[in-house]
């Protein structure tokens, strides 16, 4: 699995916490300390705070340097991303298969979502020139019975106040095909052996801007799927694995049955041999009597 890269949206700075209040016993104990001891403690606390500020300053500097390196390598990766997209275009249903095989994304997909995603031909993730300012995810679709758009996009950025924000393409749904307004229904797909209430449509993600700073689906696509989608496309189908397991069990049972038959046959042959031996002994006894 590809390593997760640092999010382009900068983390909020943590304010230093004040030292915990002293309990009654500690207060009374410290009250008995010489003033010199109190002064040394206060000076130590102030020095610790100064050192911590230096550590925080270096951490911020490191983050800036990491972002610069990431920006440099983003440019170097672009030709390879383009070549990969051209090759992926030769594989039918690559992206819908990748999404269905991803455990977090598949949990968001209903039956009709999967049908719509069969028309998805390309996915592109673009990180902005100033990485800290955000990124955009573009979904390219063939002509389909659900909506008019050829491209659906969602963008994550920092607004004027510096807070995470997002915006997206307005989906132009065809008459009666708005998947975000469908009623909840029960799904039973024998091919994937699941029966549960339909999840909220995947496409509601394009209209949900409630918490852009913690958009799990956007982060999963950008940091987990986009760096190496092939690893999820090649995940073996669980139903196939279960089917193979059942076939193996059947084969084992058949082999055990054949072994039992062979053992019974050997026992029968042994009994017949014993009967033949007894018959021969009887004939010999009769001959001796004569």
Swiss-Prot record:
Ranges where the record places region Disordered: 1-45, 158-207, 236-290
Domain of life: Eukaryota
Alphabetical GO biological process terms: DNA replication; negative regulation of DNA-templated transcription; negative regulation of neuron apoptotic process; nucleosome assembly; nucleosome disassembly
Location of Phosphoserine modifications: 7, 28, 63
Main location, first listed in the record: cytoplasm
Source lineage: Eukaryota, Metazoa, Chordata, Craniata, Vertebrata
Dimerization: annotated span: 31-78
InterPro entries referenced in this protein's UniProt entry, alphabetically: NAP-like_sf, NAP_family
Entry-annotated residues carrying N6-acetyllysine: 68, 150, 172
Family: Belongs to the nucleosome assembly protein (NAP) family.
Identification of the protein by name: Protein SET
Tissues where the protein occurs: Widely expressed. Low levels in quiescent cells during serum starvation, contact inhibition or differentiation. Highly expressed in Wilms' tumor.
Swiss-Prot/TrEMBL site (Breakpoint for translocation to form SET-CAN oncogene) positions: 283-284
Known role: Multitasking protein, involved in apoptosis, transcription, nucleosome assembly and histone chaperoning. Isoform 2 anti-apoptotic activity is mediated by inhibition of the GZMA-activated DNase, NME1. In the course of cytotoxic T-lymphocyte (CTL)-induced apoptosis, GZMA cleaves SET, disrupting its binding to NME1 and releasing NME1 inhibition. Isoform 1 and isoform 2 are potent inhibitors of protein phosphatase 2A.
Assembly and binders: Headphone-shaped homodimer. Isoforms 1 and 2 interact directly with each other and with ANP32A within the tripartite INHAT (inhibitor of acetyltransferases) complex. Isoform 1 and isoform 2 interact also with histones. Isoform 2 is a component of the SET complex, composed of at least ANP32A, APEX1, HMGB2, NME1, SET and TREX1, but not NME2 or TREX2. Within this complex, directly interacts with ANP32A, NME1, HMGB2 and TREX1; the interaction with ANP32A is enhanced after cleavage. Interacts with APBB1, CHTOP, SETBP1, SGO1.
Keywords carried by this UniProt record: Acetylation, Chaperone, Chromosomal rearrangement, Cytoplasm, Disease variant, DNA-binding, Endoplasmic reticulum, Host-virus interaction, Intellectual disability, Isopeptide bond, Methylation, Nucleus, Phosphoprotein, Proto-oncogene, Ubl conjugation
Gene Ontology MF terms: chromatin binding; DNA binding; histone binding; protein phosphatase inhibitor activity; protein phosphatase regulator activity
Biased composition (Acidic residues): 237-290
Biased composition (Basic and acidic residues): 35-45, 169-181
Compartments reported by the entry: Cytoplasm, Cytosol; Endoplasmic reticulum; Nucleus, Nucleoplasm
């Amino acid at each position: 699995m590809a390593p997760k890269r640092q999010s382009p949206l900068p983390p909020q700075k943590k304010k230093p916490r004040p030292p915990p209040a002293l309990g009654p016993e500690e207060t009374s104990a410290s009250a008995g300390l010489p003033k010199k001891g109190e002064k040394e403690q206060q000076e130590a606390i102030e020095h610790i705070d100064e050192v911590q500020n230096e550590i925080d300053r270096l951490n911020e500097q490191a983050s800036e340097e990491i972002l610069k390196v990431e920006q440099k390598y983003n440019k170097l990766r672009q030709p390879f991303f383009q070549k990969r997209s051209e090759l992926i275009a030769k594989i039918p249903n690559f992206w819908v298969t990748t999404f269905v095989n991803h455990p977090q994304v598949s949990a968001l997909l209903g039956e009709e979502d999967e049908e719509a995603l069969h028309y998805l031909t390309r996915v592109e993730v673009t990180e902005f020139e100033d990485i800290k300012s955000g990124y955009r995810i573009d979904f390219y679709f063939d002509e389909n019975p659900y909506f008019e758009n050829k491209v659906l996009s969602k963008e994550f950025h920092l607004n004027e106040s510096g807070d995470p924000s997002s915006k997206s393409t307005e989906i132009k749904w065809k008459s009666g095909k708005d998947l975000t307004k469908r009623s909840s229904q029960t799904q039973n797909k024998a091919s994937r052996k699941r029966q549960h209430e339909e999840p909220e449509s995947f496409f509601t993600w394009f209209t949900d801007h409630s918490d852009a700073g913690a958009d799990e689906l956007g982060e999963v696509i950008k940091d987990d799927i986009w760096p190496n989608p092939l690893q999820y496309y090649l995940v073996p189908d669980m139903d196939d694995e279960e089917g193979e397991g059942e076939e193996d069990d059947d084969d084992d049972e058949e082999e055990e049955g054949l072994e039992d038959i062979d053992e019974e046959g050997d026992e029968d042959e042994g009994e017949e041999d014993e009967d033949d031996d007894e018959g021969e002994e009887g004939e010999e006894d009769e001959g001796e009597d004569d």
